[in-house]
Amino acid sequence: MQCGLVFSKWIDARSGRSTDVDDDEVDAGRPAWLDGPVAGFLARFMVPPQSMGKASRIAHGLLLTALFCYSWTFILGDVRTADAWNGFLHGVNLVFHEAGHLFMMPFGRFMHVLGGTLGQLAMPLVVCIAFVVSRGDTVGASVGLWWFGQSLTDCAPYIADARKLDLQLLGGGTGAERDGHDWEYLLNTLGLAPYDLLLGSLVKYTGGAIMLLAVAWGGWMLWRAQADSARPVDI
């Protein structure tokens, strides 16, 4: 409740709306971070885009609808075959995956191998945050969050393949033909290889939930942007 009051007041101030919540209504014993930059930063993710025209709202709405439909390709995909992940986005994720390997190379073998996954997950989050910080566009940020969820599902088939090593790898050949792959090494190092299929499925559904949550967030921001545009302007 305390956090909600702080966020509500911050959002109202950003949108020009008055608030009838007095400072003394908020418990003086709340954590200090609720009044600090962290609360202000998080609250920015709850502010709808300002001055979004009707055409822009329609275009964003169509995009979110398409992403909602596309999400089910990955949510319902079989992590044992990876057929659902052999599309355009897999190639995009692969670019940042390989960049992550290079970036983490100085930090030892485990981090070097894990760096591929970290790289492909970090870039969508950077996009999400950049939309909010640089443009105040929470609808655009929701697309970045959707990409993060999709990139997480992109890891799932390789996690599930840690023991079988049947998936084709970059450059040709399967993991069995090329001494394994990233997640074969990572799960064996952590002693989790016997749970590869379970972990792969868990990662897939977690990513799918994030994708749907991102679409819901974007839809909510669009609805609030529409409500703000319909509100009479005080003169």
Q: Where are the model-predicted features located?
A:
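Cys/His-rich metal-coordination motifs, chiefly Zn-binding "fingers/knuckles"
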Residues: 1-21
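Active-site-proximal flexible loops/turns
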Residues: 9, 104-105, 123, 161
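Short, low-complexity, intrinsically disordered N-terminal peptides in bacterial proteins
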Residues: 19-21, 26, 231-235
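Short, Lys/Arg-rich, polar N-terminal cytosolic tail immediately upstream
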Residues: 23-52
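Low-complexity, intrinsically disordered, cysteine-poor segments enriched in small/polar
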Residues: 33, 37-40, 44, 91, ...
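Metalloprotease/metallohydrolase-associated module, dominated by Zn2+-dependent proteases
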Residues: 43-80, 110-235
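Interfacial/capping segments of alpha-helical transmembrane domains
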Residues: 76-92
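Active-site recognition of the HExxH zinc-binding catalytic motif
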Residues: 90-105, 116
